[in-house]
């Protein structure tokens, strides 16, 4: 009974024109996700499509990536919208997601290789995610490929590359 009442309340909140009310749905959706995943995910996707800024809500990118297998077209569209946004935070979220989906699922290949069409924030977000995956053995080579390509073809990378050396992510013998 409580779950169905909560769902009714959330559906009304999503239809509300007040963005703050819509924004406040996310903590509730995160909890309902444990009981009725499909229902919660459909509402999250709907909210992202209603207002792309909702992707900026804490943990939304993680949920968005988890929804990829079930709703790939919706997720790819939402991520691309973030990446092409004028909002720096959304560009960063979109870039992180593009980097991660390219590295783990081979999505966004055309975007990744089209460095000249990207702005500085887009490039830095993708490189940042590639650096994060350097420590994952199965994705290490793909991560190195991205980092090298972006360093070679762009002078706009401002990600602190010294972190790679400080955190022992590269081995001078095996990675030379």
Give residue ranges: language-model regions:
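Non-catalytic all-alpha helical scaffold/repeat segments
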Residues: 1-176
């Amino acid at each position: 009974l409580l779950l169905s009442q909560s769902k009714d309340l959330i559906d009304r909140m999503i239809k509300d024109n007040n963005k703050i009310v819509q924004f406040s749905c996310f903590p509730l959706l995160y909890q309902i996700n444990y009981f009725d995943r499909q229902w919660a995910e459909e509402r999250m996707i709907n909210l992202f499509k209603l207002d792309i800024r909702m992707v900026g809500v804490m943990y939304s990118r993680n949920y968005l990536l988890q929804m990829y297998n079930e709703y790939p077209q919706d997720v790819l569209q939402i991520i691309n919208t973030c990446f092409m946004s004028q909002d720096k935070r959304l560009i960063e979220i979109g870039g992180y997601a593009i980097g991660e989906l390219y590295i783990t699922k081979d999505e966004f290949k055309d975007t990744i290789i089209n460095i000249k069409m990207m702005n500085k924030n887009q490039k830095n977000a993708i490189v940042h995610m590639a650096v994060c995956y350097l420590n994952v053995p199965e994705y290490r080579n793909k991560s190195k490929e991205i980092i090298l390509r972006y360093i070679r073809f762009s002078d706009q990378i401002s990600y602190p590359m010294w972190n790679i050396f400080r955190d022992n992510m590269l081995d001078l013998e095996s990675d030379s």
